[in-house]
Amino acid sequence: MMKRAAAAAVGGALAVGAVPVVLSAMGFTGAGIAASSIAAKMMSAAAIANGGGVSAGSLVATLQSVGAAGLSTSSNILLASVGSVLGACLGNSPSSSLPAEPEAKEDEARENVPQGEPPKPPLKSEKHEE
C-alpha cells in the first residue's frame, strides 16, 4: 500500500513539474518563443497554414501562453490528479519489481565454466619456405 501511495505522489509531482521543463525545452519560454527552436518551427508552420498569422486558441498560441504565464491552478490540479492515478497504476504493477533469479540445476551446463579440457597448443610452428 505504501509503495502505491509513494508512486502516486511521485507521479503527481512529476506530471506538474514536467510541463514547464518540456515547454521550455521546446522553446516556449517566459520571454516568448526562442529562435531556431521547435516552437519557432511550429509557429512558422501555423502562420503559413493560416495565411500569415497564428490564430488565437490554436495549439501554438496555447503553448506560448502556458510557457509565458504557466498553468492555472485548476490545470495543475488536473495534471496532478492524472499523474497520481498513472503513478499508482504503474507502482502497483507486478513488472515494477525485479523477478527472482531462477536457480541453476547441478546437471545443467553453467556459462563461463570450462566443461572439458582446453585445446592443446601446437607442438611446433610450421613455416612454408619457397
From Swiss-Prot:
InterPro entries (alphabetical): IFI6/IFI27-like, IFI6/IFI27-like_sf
Main location: mitochondrion
A Gene Ontology biological process term: apoptotic process
Segments for region (Disordered): 93-130
Membrane-crossing residue ranges in chain numbering: 8-28, 43-63, 66-86
Membrane topology, as annotated: Multi-pass membrane protein
Domain of life: Eukaryota
Keywords, comma-separated and alphabetical: Apoptosis, Membrane, Mitochondrion, Transmembrane, Transmembrane helix
Gene Ontology CC terms: mitochondrial membrane; mitochondrion
Gene Ontology MF annotations: molecular adaptor activity
UniProt subcellular location: Mitochondrion membrane
Keyword flag Ion transport: no
Reported induction: Not up-regulated by type-I interferon.
Function noted in UniProt: Plays a role in the apoptotic process and has a pro-apoptotic activity.
Family the UniProt entry places it in: Belongs to the IFI6/IFI27 family.
Name the UniProt record assigns to this protein: Interferon alpha-inducible protein 27-like protein 2
